[in-house]
């Protein structure tokens, strides 16, 4: 995975989930907050991160910092993805299909956040497994990592791009 420097990108962030987690100790319960945040430049770069802290804003800040360290590049054809892909992480399975221009983002919840911040404007997706936000986000990003441009596929097969496209 190639490191993408977040300093050169204009990143937007979106909080996907905030969880209240409790640790039971002898004196009672200790409350903390866990935040899941997605960042992206709406131009082919997206990442996610998690953060935990005693206060919600601090957890979000940590999650944003973490997300900036985990940026991935998303290959795109116009405003959609180059081919169909299934992203899997844990129990989360996300099917993503390219869509014609103007159809918009047909995705729910955490998947929509990832795809919109990646800059994918036209796509159809379906969540096939777990609906836990962290697994869904990770599965979506795994799917986006699997995407290949026509040039990459042609090079792997030892053919020209024209032969691949058809």
From Swiss-Prot:
SUPFAM superfamilies: dsRNA-binding domain-like, Ribosomal protein S5 domain 2-like. Part of the 30S ribosomal subunit. Contacts proteins S4 and S8. HAMAP family: Ribosomal_uS5_B (MF_01307_B). This is Small ribosomal subunit protein uS5. The N-terminal domain interacts with the head of the 30S subunit; the C-terminal domain interacts with the body and contacts protein S4. The interaction surface between S4 and S5 is involved in control of translational fidelity. Keywords: Ribonucleoprotein, Ribosomal protein, RNA-binding, rRNA-binding. Residues 11-74 form the S5 DRBM domain. Pfam families: Ribosomal_S5, Ribosomal_S5_C.
